Amino acid sequence: MKIGIIGAMEEEVTLLRDKIDNRQTITLGGCEIYTGQLNGTEVALLKSGIGKVAAALGATLLLGHCKPDVIINTGSAGGLASTLKVGDIVVSDEARYHDADVTAFGYEYGQLPGCPAGFKADDKLIAAAESCIRELNLNAVRGLIVSGDAFINGSVGLAKIRHNFPDAVAVEMEATAIAHVCHNFNVPFVVVRAISDVADQQSHLSFDEFLAVAAKQSTLMVETLVQKLAHG
């Protein structure tokens, strides 16, 4: 099995990259892909860049060039669920765009023409992630993750997301674009991210402060998940 892993930022991939043996670097379209073995398992780790376009471009390049069997999207996220705090884990059962609106033509809010309203994560990957969470004794929430090209740092943006997606557990800027690409290529995916901030008017301050905490927690989760997927 070859496992594809996608993170947006240097801070979100550096700990995993440093653990890859026999590492080779491929630079394509402004993205970097690091291939090799993570604890004996073949992996391809993509640093995509921030935002939906960068994530979709990177995911497409990763799938075409490295042909992974599954995709794990990792990194940081803003917490929406009331039980989440910095360092906790969110696992997707679905991903949706929070900044797409074609409702004038009868689509659901967040749905693009020709696409489902939401992109469902793979049940087996979700189950494996939840098993890792139990083994590591981490606090985690499973649910809807929403994505858009905005860092949510104010009451207006937050209220809009809560109104349109009351069940959303976390918000970030890449996961749904990656899920969209995986859907088109029929490749199983799951989003496993750590909370770096709680989406509110001070989220930019806590993001800067706690990104390293989120990166450490998400790396631990992904490393454990890769082992479980490879060896059961």
From Swiss-Prot:
The active site is at E12 (proton acceptor), D197 (proton donor). One of its GO terms (molecular function) is adenosylhomocysteine nucleosidase activity. InterPro entries: MTA_SAH_Nsdase, Nucleoside_phosphorylase_d, Nucleoside_phosphorylase_sf. Its EC number is 3.2.2.9. This is 5'-methylthioadenosine/S-adenosylhomocysteine nucleosidase. It catalyses: S-adenosyl-L-homocysteine + H2O = S-(5-deoxy-D-ribos-5-yl)-L-homocysteine + adenine; S-methyl-5'-thioadenosine + H2O = 5-(methylsulfanyl)-D-ribose + adenine; 5'-deoxyadenosine + H2O = 5-deoxy-D-ribose + adenine. It is an enzyme of class 3 (hydrolase). Keywords: Amino-acid biosynthesis, Hydrolase, Methionine biosynthesis. It comes from the Bacteria. Catalyzes the irreversible cleavage of the glycosidic bond in both 5'-methylthioadenosine (MTA) and S-adenosylhomocysteine (SAH/AdoHcy) to adenine and the corresponding thioribose, 5'-methylthioribose and S-ribosylhomocysteine, respectively. Also cleaves 5'-deoxyadenosine, a toxic by-product of radical S-adenosylmethionine (SAM) enzymes, into 5-deoxyribose and adenine. Thus, is required for in vivo function of the radical SAM enzymes biotin synthase and lipoic acid synthase, that are inhibited by 5'-deoxyadenosine accumulation. Substrate binds at G78, I152, M173, E174. The lineage of its organism: Bacteria, Pseudomonadati, Pseudomonadota, Gammaproteobacteria, Enterobacterales. One of its GO terms (biological process) is L-methionine salvage from S-adenosylmethionine. SUPFAM superfamilies: Purine and uridine phosphorylases. GO terms for cellular component: cytosol. The keyword Cell division does not apply. Homodimer. NCBIfam families: MTA_SAH-Nsdase (TIGR01704), PRK05584.1 (NF004079). Pathway: Amino-acid biosynthesis; L-methionine biosynthesis via salvage pathway; S-methyl-5-thio-alpha-D-ribose 1-phosphate from S-methyl-5'-thioadenosine (hydrolase route): step 1/2. The keyword Disulfide bond does not apply. The gene is mtnN. Belongs to the PNP/UDP phosphorylase family. MtnN subfamily.
